Structures are given as C-alpha cells and as structure tokens.
C-alpha cells in the first residue's frame, strides 16, 4: 500500500545523548544517557547506580502507582517513564538503552520536550530489521466507572489518538477534545510540549501528603479557576488534553511495538491505559501465533 508514514524498518538513535534534571515526584537529581541499541532490543532502562540493573519498558513490568507509571524488574525500579516513552514512540525509536543513576526520570518542564529535543539532536538511524507492529483489527475496550479507553481499526496505516477530557463546568479546564494522527501530525511540535497539569486544590492535597514540595510553576502547570498560575501561559488552548494524549502514547508504548489503529479515550488515566495495553498485548500475541 504505497509509502506510509509508518516507519517500515527499526530505528535507534545515531549517537549517545545526555541530559539531567530532577524527578517530578522525588525531587532527586538524575542524569540520563540514551545509548543506541541493536535491532529487536526494544526500549530498556538501566540503573547505573544499581550495577546497571535492567528494566525493560514492558507492560509486564508495571507496578501500580498513583498519577504516574512505574516499572520494576527484580530490585530495580524506574519511575515516571511515560514522558520519555512517549517521546521515543512519537519519534519512532524502536531500540534504545536509557541509563539513569536514580529511580525517577527527570521531569523537565512537565512535558516530553526535553526528551524529543535530545533525541532529535542525537539523530536517528535506520537498521535493516523490519519493524513489527500491532494492527488493530478487533475492537477492544476497557472501562472504570465513566472512564473508558478503546482501540479500534483505523482506515489509515497510522496511529490516531482521540482524547476527551471532561472536568466540571466550574473548572478552568472544562471540556476538551483533541485528535492527533501520526499520518499528518507532527508529534514533536504538537504533542511533546504539552505539560503535566494539576489543579490548585490537588496541589494542596499532594503537598499535605509530602509530594512535590520542591515543585514550582517551571516544573508543572498549576491551574486554578482562571487558568494557569505562577505567570504561566498555555502553550496550546487545549494543552491539558494534549498532555493526556502524550501520556497515553507513552503508556501504550509498553506494548513494545507501534500500533496501527485508533485509540479513543474518555477521562482515561494511567491505570486504564495499562489495562488496555495488556488487552492489546494479548491481541498482538495471537496475531503473531497466526502468522
């Protein structure tokens, strides 16, 4: 079917790349080094401070945590992986070793931009190995209360994400709907810069629980009834829903392969995203068996 946007061969970064920062939840200083990896290696985190203990970015390694995605293999844990995985998925990187010297990835400004910037600067190389992918041919959906996320077939050879965010009317976020399609959208400029957001009321609860005491408006978007606080402005009119798309793309990359299909989400968060990912892994394994 002609040339499609879906990259047909596996890719990795062209050279080693580095960045550092502080964890969003822990506030710990952390250095990150991205290393090129061979075909079929996948995305693997390596804890430099734990003798290089590896944690593959796979749904089987997810440990349930509030408000973030956490992975564990053996003694090694890696926290807040969704933004870096979203950047790798968004830029079609199949294989990469992400070396870190603390448990949590850097938060940057709360978006995936620090990661897309460093990956694009390093450059991308293509191998001869064909890229495996999951083509959604059977609809699958998971829900929890009124929150739902579904994967359905798509008429284009690409991934499309439709997200509907619905906060109460009295909230500055309100109701937002955004559609991003890799067939004609540009992930690095349209999704990656969208920042993590919290409501002012939630910040008080988090601080009371001892979380995020170090955070300032440079680290995260705090929204009250008037909109962003602390001198921040929205980067997009619908920045909150775009960030939800960013998280969803990152969580779904725990499948280990790119998806061709449409993902439709309403009020979905990490736990539900992971549940969909598990259902898709089942579908992917069945497809591979029948090939």
Predicted segment positions?
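C-terminal regulatory domains involved in ligand/effector binding and gene-expression control
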Residues: 2-94, 99-291
């Amino acid at each position: 079917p002609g040339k499609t946007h879906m990259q047909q061969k596996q890719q990795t970064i062209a050279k080693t790349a580095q960045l550092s920062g502080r964890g969003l939840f822990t506030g710990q200083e952390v250095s990150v080094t991205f290393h090129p990896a061979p075909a079929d290696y996948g995305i693997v985190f390596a804890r430099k401070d734990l003798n290089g203990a590896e944690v593959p970015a796979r749904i089987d390694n997810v440990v349930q945590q509030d408000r973030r995605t956490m992975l564990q293999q053996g003694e090694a844990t890696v926290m807040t992986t969704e933004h870096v995985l979203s950047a790798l998925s968004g830029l079609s990187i199949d294989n990469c070793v992400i070396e870190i010297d603390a448990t949590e990835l850097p938060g940057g400004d709360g978006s995936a931009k620090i990661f897309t910037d460093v990956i694009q600067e390093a450059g991308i190389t293509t191998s001869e190995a064909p890229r495996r992918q999951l083509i959604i041919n059977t609809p699958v959906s998971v829900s929890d209360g009124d929150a739902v996320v579904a994967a359905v077939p798509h008429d284009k050879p690409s991934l499309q994400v439709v997200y509907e965010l619905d906060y109460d009317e009295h909230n500055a976020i309100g109701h937002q709907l955004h559609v991003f399609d890799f067939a004609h959208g540009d992930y690095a400029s349209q999704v990656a810069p969208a920042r993590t957001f919290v409501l002012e009321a939630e910040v008080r609860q988090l601080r009371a629980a001892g979380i995020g005491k170090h955070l300032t408006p440079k680290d995260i978007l705090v929204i009250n009834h008037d909109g962003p606080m602390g001198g921040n402005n929205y980067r997009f009119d619908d920045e909150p829903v775009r960030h939800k798309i960013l998280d969803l793309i990152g969580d779904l990359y725990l499948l280990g392969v790119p998806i061709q299909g449409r993902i439709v989400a309403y009020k979905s968060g990490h736990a539900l995203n992971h549940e969909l990912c598990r259902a898709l892994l089942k579908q992917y394994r069945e497809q591979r068996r029948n090939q």
